[in-house]
Curated annotation (Swiss-Prot):
Protein name (database record): ATP-dependent protease subunit HslV
Catalytic residues identified in the record: 7
GO BP term, pick one: proteolysis involved in protein catabolic process
Pfam families for this protein: Proteasome
Sequence similarity: Belongs to the peptidase T1B family. HslV subfamily.
Catalysed reactions, as listed in the record: ATP-dependent cleavage of peptide bonds with broad specificity
Length: 180
């Protein structure tokens, strides 16, 4: 049986609000859609942190668990938890094999965390990952720049995922949006 992949997460900080959206598609290999309603965006740490994953589903659950443990260990300090998780992820021979990326955010900070040790904070308050990530990122930047007065963070997140779903075959329109 092939690898299961789950893709396209978009996150935005906008006008004091924050939202993260993920589509529901899980694809086995490059040919078969196995699930349409997966939940790839979650609230963690008593609802104060959002986390979303793109990549292998089983690997992502391992990383969610590991990140939540780091949040508890560092009392909700998002940046410290992300850095410590990235160090552990990169430094452990078994964890290095995990194929997933995470976006984590709270009301003030948003970070991309990867297994190669990157912990990246965007300049513009927008991040997107997964197969439709570039489409969602482009749409989100345009919406934030040109329609920001008229849209909420949640609306930007949902619209960006919808546009990605129109273009990317690995992204569907079963969109879940979480806000803080």
């Amino acid at each position: 049986m092939g690898n299961f992949h789950a893709t396209t997460i978009f996150a935005v900080h906008h006008n004091g609000e924050c939202a993260m959206a993920g589509d529901g598609q899980v694809t086995m290999g490059n040919a078969v859609v196995m699930k349409h309603t997966a939940r790839k965006v979650r609230k963690l740490f008593q609802g104060k942190v959002l986390a979303g994953f793109a990549g292998s589903v089983a690997d992502a659950f391992t990383l969610f668990e590991m990140f939540e443990g780091k949040l508890e260990e560092y009392n909700g300090n998002l940046q410290r938890a992300a850095v410590e998780m990235a160090k552990q992820w990169r430094g452990d021979k078994m964890l290095r094999q995990l194929e997933a990326m995470l976006i984590v955010m709270d009301k003030t900070t948003m970070l991309l965390v990867s297994g190669t040790g990157e912990v990246i904070e965007p300049d513009d308050g927008i991040l997107a990952i997964g197969s439709g990530g570039n489409y969602a990122l482009s749409a989100g930047r345009a919406l934030k720049q040109y329609a920001s007065e008229h849209l909420t963070a949640k609306q930007i997140a949902k619209a960006s995922l919808n546009i990605a779903g129109d273009i990317c075959v690995y992204t569907n329109h079963n969109i879940i949006v979480e806000e803080l």
